[in-house]
């Protein structure tokens, strides 16, 4: 957890003054939405961010775009899926919510691979998701990604899908995982090549976990 001097307080948030590398920063830490005690963060990472937090940082960015003096945002974001999994967040048990998230992850992954790009570390921790009834997934943190071709691309695609499944196999049902794969391929049912690829995905991390 971020530590610093508390300079402001409300029923749902705290503002901390933090010094790092000789520079002073202010971090707004959300404690909840007023109805529960689930901790949420603004400026750093936390659990699923409430819509008011997202709106707040977007407004600050708009103010700066319009030339209105405001604090410079040096960090803002939502939470990665892996934290939700390790915290056993109830969102993961909401099948409708998860269906929306998985559909977006499938679309993101398909778009990357269709362009010949492999993420190379496509794990849940590199996917941010906001809250609300209509969640939005954001892809972050891709220092190892790059363009590939031929058999090299095919291998990297298997790796990307295996990275996603590394947590999914413990958090999702078999039907959810199958639905994700079908959304990724844009198909209604599995073909022979799909079954071969799935076997490679499942075997990718065998003996390495």
Go through the PLM ranges and name each one:
Residues 1-85, 104, 110-115, 119:
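Conserved ATP-binding subdomain of kinase catalytic cores across diverse folds
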Residues 138-207:
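C-lobe/activation-segment region of protein kinase-like
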Residues 122-129:
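Hydrophobic residue at the +6 position relative to the catalytic HRD Asp in the kinase catalytic loop
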Residues 25, 69, 136-138, 162:
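Protein kinase-like catalytic core scaffold
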């Amino acid at each position: 957890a971020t530590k610093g001097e508390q300079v402001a307080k409300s029923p749902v948030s705290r503002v901390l003054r933090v010094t790092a590398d000789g520079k002073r920063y202010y971090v707004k830490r959300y404690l909840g939405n007023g109805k529960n005690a689930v901790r949420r963060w603004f400026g750093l990472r936390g659990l699923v961010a409430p819509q008011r937090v997202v709106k707040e940082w977007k407004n600050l960015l708009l103010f700066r775009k319009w030339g209105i003096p405001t604090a410079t945002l040096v960090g803002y974001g939502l939470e990665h899926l892996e934290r939700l999994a390790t915290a056993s967040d109830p969102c993961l048990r909401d099948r409708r919510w998860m269906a929306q998230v998985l559909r977006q992850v499938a679309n993101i992954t398909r778009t990357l691979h269709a362009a010949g790009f492999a993420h190379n570390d496509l794990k849940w921790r590199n996917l941010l998701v906001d809250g609300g009834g209509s969640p939005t997934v954001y892809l972050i943190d891709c220092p190892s990604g790059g363009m590939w071709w031929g058999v090299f691309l095919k291998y990297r695609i298997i790796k990307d899908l295996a990275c996603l499944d590394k947590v999914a196999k413990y958090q999702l049902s078999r039907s959810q995982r199958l639905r994700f794969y079908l959304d990724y391929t844009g198909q209604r049912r599995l073909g022979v090549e799909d079954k071969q690829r799935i076997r490679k995905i499942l075997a990718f991390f065998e003996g390495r976990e």
